């Protein structure tokens, strides 16, 4: 049934609109904070609305980069970046500390500066540009966790570099070095010095490395080719985590990020990773979205909830605040593809023929796959 209609660019734009339009009324007066609820998290309350603000960028940025727009949002974000990074503003986000949640959130801002500077940098006044640049550089003075967080300084300093701002090349090199040290083979990384092999591999480590592969293709062609090769290998294993109905394994941390489970496939399209046909990849992504949207994942105001198939605080981590689920918007990186990209015209196709049993050695997992369900044994 999924291939019966044309899932063109407009289909994905409409999905994104459905997710972000209900948020518009919840921004602070200057736009730097997004207030979505009253549950707490393991970090400072003042960072919670900043997280909400930043995470929506995972969806808006590729929309803007691909030539799209949702009325009013680019103005909110230019104003919000100005206020959030101005120490004299009442909406200032505050400085950083070791292990700060804001390190995660400035990665989304950096993504925006890399892909959509016309919306997030060029409209800013000279003073606002100086403040934003200084704010991002301030984060360079702090150590980040030795896991997927190592890629945040990489994105921050790539963004600064792309805007001809002072940046720290050492932090880019060191982050990429650490990423290489996490590599296990067959496309798999570990998320730091740990046994964790969960969705942070596709929606964090691969996701960031594929952004790098796209934006640094001319500056660092060898490494970019390597990142794409690893993603190709990973895709052949990760596909086993999805069943023919679009559902993915309920496994590991941060399950409230829901359809971020498909972000890897979207990032492969963005970075021109050639592994399965456009039709197969479109089928995986579309079935996944359709499956999610059949479930009550938003509240009655259209805001994504903490939970999984339905609102459920038992499915949260200590670091999940009301804005956290918008990490799921990473799945929309495919909107950065130009309108004429062949993906938009491709027909959604079913999964290819997969083995009934598959040993994913680096993931320490055996998958039993019979089409309409995937079961993992770990």
Where is each model-derived feature located?
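Short, glycine-/Ser/Thr-/acidic-enriched flexible segments
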Residues: 272, 333, 372-374
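Short acidic-hydrophobic surface loop/beta-edge motif
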Residues: 366-370
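Non-catalytic carbohydrate-binding regions of carbohydrate-active enzymes
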Residues: 235-262, 268-316, 320, 339-364
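Long, hydrophobic alpha/beta structural blocks
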Residues: 327, 333-336
